[in-house]
Each structure stands twice: as C-alpha cells, then as structure tokens.
C-alpha cells in the first residue's frame, strides 16, 4: 500500500498526474486535512474527484496550534491504519510534518518532494525552514526541481545519492495542455469587455513567512479607485475578512468556490500574487504577473532573472505596473521552454520508486 498525505492545494495539482502511475504499482490511499478556515485542499480534491480520508485540520498561525493539529493528525493516521488493518509500504508527501514523523516512527520509507527548503534564495543554515528541519532528515529519498540547489538538502544530512533533481518546474505538470474551461467571469456577472485582474493573498500563515504585510490589501483599494477593471480576489484561508473589507466596492469580487485552472487563467489579463505557485502558473502561461510577496525564494529569482514577473514593494508600484501592463495588452505566449528542460512527467520518478522500494532483492 502506498500512502500520500496531501496538505496544501499545490500538491493536489502536483500529485494528480502521479496517481495513475502509482496505482499500477500498488493500492494507494490518500489523506488530507481540512477545517472551516482551511478547506481549499479538501475542496480541490473533491473537485478532481480524488478520494481522500480527511484526517484533522490546520493549526493556524500559532506554534501551539500547529503542534496540537499535528499531534491530532498523527493519532488519526494510527487509527486509520488500524481500521484498514495494514501499514503502508512507502509514504509520499510534499509538506506534511506529521505524515513524515508518523511514517518514520513506523519504519515506513519517506519520499519527500521539497521545493522550499529555505526561506530565501541564498543558502545559509539559518535560512533552513522549520518544515525542512522537521522532515528532510527523516526522508529516504528527496526529489526537487532543478532551480533549487542540492546543497539545501545535503545540509540536513540527506545523502547525495538520495537527492534527485527533476528537470522541470512543478506547474508545468498541470498546465502544459491547459484548455479553456467555463468562463468564471460569467458566473460572477463580470463585464467581459473590461480587463480582469486576479489577486491572490500571500501565504502569511506559512512556516517561512514572518508576518502578514498589508500591501496586497492596500493595493486592492488603490486599484479599485484608480482603474476601470474587474478585480477578483482568490482567498487563501477564508473569505469572511475579505468580504468585510472589500464587499462594498463595486468592482471588487471575491471568489467563494474553488475553480479549475482552466476556468480562470484563460480569462484574466493580469495576476497580482502574494504567493509562489500562482505566480509560477501565470508566468508559465505568459500572463503578466506582479509579485508582492515579502521574500524571494529560488523560484522567484528565476522568474525575475528571466523577466517573466515584476516585483512591487508598495501599492503605488503595483498601480504603476498594472497601468503599464493594461495599456499594452497582447495575447499571452506560454513560456514552457523556461519551465521544462525536459518534458514534465512522473515516469522517471515512479520508475525510481519501483526500483528502490518494490523490486525484490
């Protein structure tokens, strides 16, 4: 039995293409987490009709809350395996401390997909994230995208032969063949003749983000009063606070449901992103992108060096870039060649797993 713990939305999209290959090897079970303020991952699994056991929830921003949630989930995993009457042969994850520690404690090999080992873009031991410190040393095998140096993983004691780079950036897996889906603007009742700006909050509760900055929210107010455009906010943790702050603005709309990428990317003219994954997605698709995030990771530097993205430090800079972009819109041209040194896929990765963990000695 192969066990995956999928704990954030990015890894739903990431592992979706891997599941059919894994199911050819052995039975696969998937666990996830979800609660009222953090249901995006669970809803995305449901959207793609991926069956999963929902074990525990998200602990929030506090250290105590995170620890309590992890302990509850670990007990939940043990109860699940007891109900199933069997223990997994391998464990696969992208960002699950409790999954890694449960698997390690049970003697289950840990396969880790890790793309954010440090909180920054220049290596130092001090920059290693809490997530990395709690998971990578317990990993039997670590896979990472080519833009992140192997040094980040070696520093935590992972042997060189157990660190494997793949020659693509994750978002290429699910965006390469993106087709136009149902136009989300119709459901929101937006005027399709106006430019459409999608806005994504920073992952301010994440382990590698030090504080919640106001720039993205101040930018919404400034853009709303300065541009004749549709502003659509995609919440990260919950919509209640956003509705309270922006609900009275006629040209600001807040998404309440989870959408497939095919339903919104083909219909937006600009992405303003405080996070990482959606900035990468829009840059891959050739959509103009403004980053407001509070720190640079290796991926951000790669996008900036290749002139795929702007970075703004103030709402005024956001407005400047937005006006300039909207004044000379052209059809987006995908940048696949910068994201795929070789065709994105899981075939080589799954073959490695078969050889290492499922081939009789």
Located regions from the model:
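Conserved nucleotide-sugar phosphate-binding/catalytic loop shared by glycosyltransferases and other
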Residues: 6, 26-69
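C-terminal amphipathic helix plus adjacent low-complexity
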Residues: 329-361
């Amino acid at each position: 039995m192969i066990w995956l713990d999928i704990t954030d939305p990015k890894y739903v999209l990431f592992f979706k293409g891997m599941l059919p290959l894994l199911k050819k090897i052995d039975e696969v079970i998937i666990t996830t987490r979800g609660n009222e303020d953090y249901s995006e991952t669970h809803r995305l699994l449901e959207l793609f009709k991926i069956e999963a056991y929902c074990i525990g929830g998200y602990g929030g921003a506090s250290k105590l809350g995170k620890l309590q949630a992890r302990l509850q989930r670990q007990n939940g995993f043990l109860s699940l395996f007891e109900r199933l009457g069997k223990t997994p042969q391998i464990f696969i994850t992208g960002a699950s401390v409790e999954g890694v520690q449960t698997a390690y404690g049970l003697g289950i090999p840990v396969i880790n997909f890790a793309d954010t080992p440090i909180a920054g873009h220049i290596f130092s031991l001090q920059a290693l994230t809490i997530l990395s410190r709690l998971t990578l040393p317990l990993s039997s095998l670590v896979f990472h995208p080519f833009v992140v140096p192997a040094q980040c993983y070696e520093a935590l004691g992972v042997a060189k032969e157990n660190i494997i780079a793949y020659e693509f950036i994750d978002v290429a897996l699910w965006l390469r063949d993106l087709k136009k889906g149902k136009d989300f603007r119709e459901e929101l009742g937006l005027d399709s003749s106006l430019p459409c700006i999608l806005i994504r909050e920073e992952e301010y509760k994440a382990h590698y983000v030090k504080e919640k900055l106001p720039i993205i929210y101040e930018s919404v107010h400034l853009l709303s009063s300065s541009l004749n455009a549709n502003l659509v906010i995609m919440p990260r943790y919950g919509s209640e606070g956003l509705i309270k702050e922006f609900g009275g603005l006629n040209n600001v709309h807040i998404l309440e449901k989870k959408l497939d990428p095919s339903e919104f990317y083909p219909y937006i003219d600009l992405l303003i992103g405080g996070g990482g994954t959606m900035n990468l997605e829009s840059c891959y698709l050739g959509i103009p992108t403004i980053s407001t995030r509070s720190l640079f990771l290796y991926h951000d530097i790669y996008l900036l060096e290749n002139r795929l993205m702007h970075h703004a430090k103030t709402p005024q800079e956001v407005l400047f870039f937005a006006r300039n972009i909207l004044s000379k819109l052209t059809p987006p041209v995908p940048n696949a060649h910068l994201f795929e040194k070789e065709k994105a896929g899981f075939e080589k990765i799954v073959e490695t797993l078969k050889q290492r963990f499922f081939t009789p000695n």
